[in-house]
Each structure stands twice: as C-alpha cells, then as structure tokens.
C-alpha cells in the first residue's frame, strides 16, 4: 500500500465513529428520498388503474339546465367516444341519527355509467327497476359503518324520502373526499356522496 492509502486507513480507524455517522446519514438520506418516491409511483399506478377501470372522465362541464338530448349530441362530436349526462344536487340527510350534507348523483336508469363507473365495495348495484334504493360512497360507508339494508333519509326540495342502502361503492371522482375546491379535507361525518 502507498503511504497515502496507509494514512487513509489509519484515519478511518481513528475516526470510525464519524465515518459511521456519515455513512448512516447518507443511507438515511437515500431511504428518505426513495421511500416517498416509490410510494408516489405506486399510488399513481393505483389511481391510473382505477381511472382506467372506471372510464374516468377526461373532461366535464356543469350547467344548471340542459335538454335530455345534450349528451347524445356531444357524443356525436369528432374525437368524443362517450358522453353522459347526470343530475347532481346537494341535500340534507339523516343516517343512524346523524345529520349531514350529501351530494346526490344520479346513475343511468338502465345499466351502469359509461363514464365515471362505480366499483362495488360491499353489497350490490341498484336493483333494476326498483325504487327506494341508494348506493353510498365508501367514505360515508366507512364513517358510519353502513351496511346494505340500512335506511338513509334524504330531505330535499320535494320533502323527505327514505332509501334502503343497496351497497357501498368507490367512485373515481371521490378517491379523496373533497366537497369543493375551497376545501382541502372534508369531514366524512359532515359530508357524503350517495
């Protein structure tokens, strides 16, 4: 060994604690960088998978009123593969003695949504042709431990209506429950989606 290498080995042996601390700090830095990076990549893959499975919207537009034929006319435009209309309203609800605001989102009378499809978590999809049933989004279901068959009462413009819960669903629009762009986090005990 050359004199310089011998001196290096002597210095490493003398300052072993400092060398160990430097190695530990570098290793922790690498772990702290790669851990979140890998978690973000996995989360992005999961979200993209759900978006693909549910045919998540590329674009949406809100309006107060539109003719029933509007979605069909939009679907006939070039480069538009699917367009679907639905009604979205907010109302007050009671579930297991708790009052909260719910966002009521309609689904097609026949079949399942072609855009923003739903993944059944518990229970089943709405029974065809049967009224009086609703599905609840999984944040609401988890918050109140809702199971199929339990009642949910909605108070709207036309009065009070009680529905039987048919199932709990995951919606691509509400992977993270947010009521509006002004809120960063929404309390599922105060707001839900049905």
What is the role of each PLM region?
Residues 87, 103-107, 119-194:
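Hydrophobic secondary-structure segments that place a key small or acidic residue at a functional site
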Residues 69, 112, 173-174:
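Residue-level signal for secondary-structure boundary sites
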Residues 111-118:
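Cytochrome P450 core scaffold surrounding the K-helix E-X-X-R motif
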Residues 14-18, 53, 158, 171:
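Membrane-interface junctions
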